[in-house]
């Protein structure tokens, strides 16, 4: 790959906490010239990160990667309307930012596809206009991901969502899936595309036990169930509220839920906990750097991971 020039399209990028930042740094370390077309950092809270606003900065560099930022409507408040506007605004503004890349000839386009699938639009348009191959790493499969957070039962709307989503996937020369099961689904959607499976990775630090005496002392004497990650509608965290209700009814105070992280559904989850009067069964630790997480995993008696069906 040395000497290749790659255009990466991803709505989210550094300083937001997404794996694409590491992937691009890896491309650059391998000798590629990497440009990223992305949005402005405001995920997950919907507030601009320090040093950013709608007007920019629109051009930066980080870890050997050149960053071109397009405007987007921030997710402020994480209401359904604001999330919808955020979803729509990035692909539109990014499309109009493609002329900024004029004269920067690329050998390939790489799209890091998170929600929504519409964020692929600038990648598809650039790849077709300039006749360069498009590779899409599918993180959120649409429309299935949409249905996991928004129950759409109208058959006509489901048909439209499926048609639009599948159209985007079929525009890629290569699709990268996170698992064999997802690869099988993509094979049915886009049979002509080349496909490969690249599982999500984690840092080596997660394999180590890290004992933090102060942390372990805070949660001593209880069975601690730890969730560490993104608090979003796709994660079935309300299930823990139901568990807490049952524990309360049984007068069981020896089980405790520790939530490490942040996300668009945190406020709603805290409100549900308050409404159920089970706040004593929960501790919210907020966002932590990845280097802190092994200590929480070591302290935990059980880890929680669940997705909405």
Predicted regions and their residues:
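An aromatic- and histidine-rich active-site surface loop
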Residues: 17, 83-98, 108-139, 143-145
């Amino acid at each position: 790959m040395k000497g290749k020039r790659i255009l990466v399209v991803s709505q989210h990028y550094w300083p937001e906490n997404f794996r694409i930042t590491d992937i691009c740094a890896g491309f650059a370390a391998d000798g590629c010239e990497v440009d990223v077309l992305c949005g402005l950092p405001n995920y997950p809270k919907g507030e601009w990160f320090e040093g950013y606003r709608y007007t920019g900065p629109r051009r930066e560099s980080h870890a050997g990667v050149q960053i071109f930022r397009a405007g987007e409507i921030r997710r402020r408040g994480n209401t359904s309307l604001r999330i919808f506007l955020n979803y729509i605004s990035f692909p539109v503004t990014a499309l109009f930012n493609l002329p900024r890349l004029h004269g920067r000839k690329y050998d390939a386009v790489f799209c890091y596809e998170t929600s929504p699938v519409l964020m692929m639009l600038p990648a598809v348009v650039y790849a077709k206009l300039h006749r360069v191959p498009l590779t899409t790493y599918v993180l959120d499969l649409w429309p299935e991901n949409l249905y996991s957070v928004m129950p759409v039962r109208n058959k006509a709307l489901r048909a439209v969502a499926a048609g639009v989503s599948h159209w985007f996937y079929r525009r890629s020369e290569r699709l990268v899936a996170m698992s064999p099961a997802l690869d099988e689904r993509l094979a049915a959607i886009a049979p002509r595309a080349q496909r490969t499976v690249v599982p999500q990775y984690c840092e080596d630090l997660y394999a180590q036990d890290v004992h933090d005496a102060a942390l372990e002392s805070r949660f001593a004497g209880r069975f601690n169930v730890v969730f560490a990650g993104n608090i979003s509608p796709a994660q079935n965290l309300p299930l823990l509220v139901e568990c807490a209700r049952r524990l309360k009814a049984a007068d069981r105070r020896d089980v405790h839920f520790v939530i490490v992280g942040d996300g668009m559904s945190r406020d709603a989850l805290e409100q549900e906990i308050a409404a159920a009067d089970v706040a004593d069964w929960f501790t919210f630790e907020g966002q932590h750097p990845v280097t802190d997480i092994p200590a929480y995993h070591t302290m935990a008696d059980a880890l929680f991971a669940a997705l909405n069906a």
